[in-house]
């Protein structure tokens, strides 16, 4: 647990002396988040510093590879810059991490359910791992699609259509055989939607089946942990102790 590892706060403080305000202002992810949260007029220092805090999270435990989405690439580059600057002053102490992007390009930057921005808790456009089956279905059935696709007979657009973006990310050949056997693959589904004659409700129901299958085992495991909260705290305690030791090395 981050709050139980004081070394992370210490590293953040040390690193803050290696990064300029102007460099943080140029970080594309920071700029986007400032705009998203309407912080232009008054930026909290803690928020502005979070790329440095993230660098501490990564380097304290000598991470060599960091799995990220496309929008986090500037953050990792910021970390790499801090590592290079630190090592140039204090010898080769820190590990410069590489990034690991999803092989499926559609997974690199999933939009929120509203289709306008990335998933954000503050915007309420997220599907959470903790969501119930009903919550997930409600969010999927209200997903942004194609505003010009008013009638089922109307030709539709798959580009910029949030449902198809999620299908690109999560659908597999077996899903069609199980849930939508009249189509051999996703391309056939896209072609039909583009021609017209395929309604949004049908593709949303298909996506819901896929997402429920994906989230069901996660939901079940979470339910098991919820039955023994003291055990969860013990896992967090032991994990924090282990990482404190690793951060000291």
Model-predicted segments: where are they?
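Divalent-metal (Mg2+/Mn2+/Ca2+)-assisted nucleotide/phosphate chemistry catalytic cores
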Residues: 1-115
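Conserved nucleotide- and phosphate/pyrophosphate-binding catalytic cores
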Residues: 80-246
């Amino acid at each position: 647990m981050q709050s139980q590892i004081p070394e992370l706060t210490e590293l953040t403080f040390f690193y803050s002396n290696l990064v300029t305000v102007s460099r943080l202002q140029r970080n594309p992810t920071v700029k986007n988040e400032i705009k998203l949260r309407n912080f232009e007029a008054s930026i909290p220092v803690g928020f502005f510093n979070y790329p440095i805090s993230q660098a501490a999270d990564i380097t304290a435990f000598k991470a060599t590879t960091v799995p990220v989405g496309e929008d986090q690439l500037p953050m990792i580059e910021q970390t790499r810059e801090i590592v290079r600057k630190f090592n140039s002053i204090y010898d080769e102490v820190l590990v410069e991490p590489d990034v690991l992007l999803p092989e499926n390009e559609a997974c690199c930057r999933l939009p929120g359910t509203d289709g306008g921005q990335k998933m954000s808790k503050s915007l309420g456009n997220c599907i959470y791992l903790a969501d119930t089956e009903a919550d997930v279905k409600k969010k999927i059935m209200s997903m942004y699609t194609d505003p010009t696709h008013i009638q089922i007979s109307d030709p539709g657009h798959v580009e910029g259509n949030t449902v198809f973006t999620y299908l690109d990310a999560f659908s597999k050949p077996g899903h069609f055989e199980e849930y939508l056997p009249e189509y051999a693959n996703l391309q056939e589904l896209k072609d039909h939607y583009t021609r017209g004659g395929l309604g949004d409700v049908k593709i949303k129901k298909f996506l819901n089946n896929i997402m429920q299958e994906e989230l069901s085992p996660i939901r079940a495991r979470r339910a098991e942990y919820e039955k023994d909260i003291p055990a969860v705290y013990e896992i967090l305690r032991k994990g924090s102790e282990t990482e404190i030791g690793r951060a000291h090395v």
